[in-house]
């Protein structure tokens, strides 16, 4: 197997006397779909927050290839190609659909203040590329006809897809999805399943997924990590996890 794209070793996160994440280890290899699951309150989102710079871990290492991420600000981690969605949709609600995708690309535009003020050819070219990229992703998720609609007026499922597209216009290596199927109906969940598979298969994106929809998780994941009360419980293929007695007990509330 190739070198891990992301390696997490001994991750710890303490809030006062509460140990929210306790010695979590995980690896992501290029173009994998890996899920992080566990009962409510298991520490999954806290792990995401550590990986993406929202929290500074109390201990452990996070390596993107050979670059340490622990303690870096979220914006810098995003520029390095690690982006995320959230449990609750976080769009610029007063902006239009396409403006949300253009704003997301602002940090990727390799033009300085001088170029922007003078509208130099390089600035105009970068702006045109950003607009083309935004339109391409809106077409892919079926929202191109709503490009000029205010984001807050979209249906909930459309807002979820827009949030993923907002990540993808930045051309990330790793996309972390925090409960993307929450609140979706069965048809929307199936479309999400297909979209995640396409991101991996056709856009070379590595996916780390937190999700409570076990049908989605078991159907799409290459590997699964399980945490309970902040502590690693198991990891393996979907079949191995499905038949793991410790995992079964945790989900039945016996662990």
Swiss-Prot record:
MF GO annotations: ATP binding; ATP hydrolysis activity; branched-chain amino acid transmembrane transporter activity; L-isoleucine transmembrane transporter activity; L-leucine transmembrane transporter activity; L-phenylalanine transmembrane transporter activity; L-valine transmembrane transporter activity
UniProt family annotation: Belongs to the ABC transporter superfamily.
InterPro entries: AAA+_ATPase (IPR003593), ABC_AA/LPS_Transport (IPR051120), ABC_transporter-like_ATP-bd (IPR003439), ABC_transporter-like_CS (IPR017871), BCA_ABC_TP_C (IPR032823), P-loop_NTPase (IPR027417)
ABC transporter domain location: 6-254
Native organism: Escherichia coli (strain K12)
GO terms under cellular component: ATP-binding cassette (ABC) transporter complex, substrate-binding subunit-containing; membrane; plasma membrane
Pfam families linked to this entry: ABC_tran, BCA_ABC_TP_C
Superkingdom assignment: Bacteria
Keyword Repeat: no
Protein role: Component of the leucine-specific transport system.
Residues holding ATP: 38-45
Record keywords: Amino-acid transport, ATP-binding, Nucleotide-binding, Transport
Keyword Nucleotide-binding appears in the UniProt entry: yes
Gene3D superfamilies attached to this UniProt entry: P-loop containing nucleotide triphosphate hydrolases (3.40.50.300)
Listed name of the protein: High-affinity branched-chain amino acid transport ATP-binding protein LivG
Example GO BP: L-alanine transport
């Amino acid at each position: 197997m190739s070198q891990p794209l992301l390696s997490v070793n001994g991750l710890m996160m303490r809030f006062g006397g509460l140990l929210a994440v306790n010695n979590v280890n995980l690896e992501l290899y290029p173009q994998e779909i890996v899920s992080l699951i566990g009962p409510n309150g298991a520490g999954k989102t806290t792990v995401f927050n550590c990986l993406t710079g929202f929290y500074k871990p109390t201990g452990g290492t996070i390596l993107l290839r050979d670059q340490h991420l622990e303690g870096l600000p979220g914006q810098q981690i995003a520029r390095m190609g690690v982006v995320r969605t959230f449990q609750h949709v976080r769009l610029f609600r007063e902006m239009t659909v396409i403006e949300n995708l253009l704003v997301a690309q602002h940090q990727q535009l390799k033009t300085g203040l001088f170029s922007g003020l003078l509208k130099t050819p390089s600035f105009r070219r970068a702006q045109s590329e950003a607009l083309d990229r935004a339109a391409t992703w809106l077409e892919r998720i079926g929202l191109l006809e709503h490009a000029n609609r205010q984001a807050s007026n979209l249906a909930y499922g459309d807002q979820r897809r827009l949030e993923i597209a907002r990540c993808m216009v930045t051309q990330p290596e790793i996309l972390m999805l925090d409960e993307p199927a929450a609140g979706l109906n069965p048809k929307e969940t199936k479309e999400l399943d297909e979209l995640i598979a396409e991101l991996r298969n056709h856009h070379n994106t590595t996916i780390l997924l937190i999700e409570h929809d076990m049908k989605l998780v078991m159907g799409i994941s290459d590997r699964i990590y399980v945490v309970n009360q902040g502590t690693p419980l198991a990891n393996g293929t979907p079949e191995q996890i499905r038949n793991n007695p410790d995992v079964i007990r945790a989900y039945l509330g016996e662990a």
